[in-house]
Each structure stands twice: as C-alpha cells, then as structure tokens.
A protein has these predicted regions:
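Conserved AAA+ ATPase small/helical "lid" subdomain
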Residues: 93-160
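AAA+ P-loop NTPase catalytic core and its hallmark functional loops
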Residues: 1-111
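C-terminal engagement/docking regions of AAA+ P-loop ATPases
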Residues: 166-167
Length: 167
C-alpha cells in the first residue's frame, strides 16, 4: 500500500523523484521490526521496491514524549542517520507570519518567548506547550473571532496544556 501510493503519486504528477516520509518510525511493533529493517536496508516492502530517485525520510519522537517508542537495535541504527531537532522560536515565528497565524498568538510569544515550548512532568501528569498547540490555538482563535465566541482560560488550556502559560 505504501509503495503503491508512491507509484500513484508519480503517475498523477509525472515526478520521478520524491521523498517517502514515514512518521513515528520508532513506534513500529516488535513483529514489524524485521520488515522495517528490510525496508531501510533494501528500500523494499516484500517484493515491492521504492522507485529509484525516491528518498526515505522518517521521523520519531523521543521516548520521554511517547510511551510507545521502541529503541532501535544496533543493526537498524547503523542504517539510519539521526538528526535531533530542537524547538526554535525564531524559525517558528517566520512560519507563523507566512501562514498568518492569529495575531494574538504571535504577539503573546513576542512578549513571552520563554513560553513557546515547555514540557514538564509533575504529580498531576505531563504539562506541555508545543508548536502544534500554538498553531491549533491560532485556528481556534480565528474561528472564535469569526463566530464572535468568547475565549477564556479554559479554552486556551485545551491547547496550551501548562497552567502558567494558559493563564
């Protein structure tokens, strides 16, 4: 199915090169690990090959963010290149401007840049604020503005899951 979608995309667009993106690669079940190793090693699923000119790119979250994460064995690690990505407010602000995120979100982060990205665990469980939360909040604020609906701390707290930031 995955390989077929690549061939479908090539047929639809006429493109001969592309990126096959696989998300949450480190959440693959133990039973699928050999298949994933074959995929990374040979660029095949079963007898179906990824077309020449296509690159495989995968992403996964660290174990502290996702309880389903499995560590790769040495054989698999030897076939991938790891690039750690850190939150970067300046880069995200460029994205926010380009995608016209709600001005209140942009203004808030200009005043309180330390609130951009936070992840903490305490007795009440995880408290977090991520780039995705800011973008989702922006969409909700835009909808509330258009529909003339009130915005309060409870609503904001659904997107910014850290009490200090949601206030």
């Amino acid at each position: 199915e995955i390989i077929a979608s690549v061939y479908d995309k090539m047929e639809q667009t006429g493109l001969e090169h592309g990126i096959l993106f696989i998300d949450e690669i480190n959440c693959v079940s133990e039973t699928l690990a050999p298949t994933m190793l074959q995929f990374l090693q040979c660029k095949t699923f079963g007898n179906q090959a990824v077309p020449a000119g296509w690159v495989i790119v995968a992403a996964g979250n660290p174990p502290e963010y996702n309880k389903s994460v499995r560590d790769f064995d040495l054989v698999t690690l030897d076939r991938v290149r790891r690039i750690d990505i850190e939150p970067n407010l300046a880069v995200w602000q460029e994205y926010a401007r380009a995608h016209r995120l709600h001005p209140a979100v942009q203004a808030y982060l200009e005043l309180r840049p330390q609130h951009f990205y936070r992840i903490q665990n305490d007795v009440d469980g995880p408290q977090f604020v991520t780039a995705r939360g800011w973008e989702d909040l922006s969409a909700m604020l835009t909808a509330c503005t258009k529909l003339d609906l009130p915005v309060d701390e409870a609503l904001i707290g659904q997107y910014l899951r850290h009490p200090e930031v949601a206030r």
